[in-house]
Amino acid sequence: MIARSAEDHFIGECDRERMEEYLEAIWILLEQGRPLVRVSWIAKRLSLSMPSVVEMLKSLDARGYVTYTIGEGILLTPKGKTIARRIVRNHRLMELLMERSIGVPMDEKSTCGFEHHMSEGMAQAICKKLGHPTECLHGQKIPTGKDCCSRSDKIQRNQKTRWG
């Protein structure tokens, strides 16, 4: 979750979720092997105008979540990576839970709503319930949790990936 500092105290829930959506989009674009992310790629991924994206990137940069250099690109800072990693993990775990445990086909809007409000404990419980999966339904890596996926869990994950 984005930290609640004195200046962030007045950020509403929708604004926090919107900021997290940008961080998630940047993570996913970087995950595709790109060294930097371009404003146009974020605009396309989130179906937003370039000026809207630039405005949010300036805000994320000012808060220390990204490094945004006009004309060059965007990178996540360690602070931004922590949040993006959590959101991506939550999203991918929720997709798997919906598909495997509930039998409900993946619904992007529902999954997106859950990812912002899922506690670390809930994410760990879902991860454990699913057998510590390494990949989501799309074959993308699921980031490991902060206190989840211990060494023995990782061995279990690797065995399930290889043999089951």
What are these regions (language model features)?
Residues 1-14:
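Short, Lys/Arg-enriched N-terminal segment that forms or immediately precedes the first helix
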Residues 57-58:
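Short, hydrophobic-biased segments on the C-terminal half of alpha helices
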Residues 51:
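Key DNA-contact positions within bacterial/archaeal DNA-binding proteins
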Residues 11-48:
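N-terminal helix-turn-helix DNA-binding core of bacterial DNA-binding proteins
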Residues 113-164:
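C-terminal regulatory/oligomerization modules of transcriptional regulators
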Residues 72-90:
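Basic, amphipathic "hinge/linker" alpha-helix immediately C-terminal to the N-terminal HTH DNA-binding motif
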Residues 61-71:
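A short, conserved structural fragment
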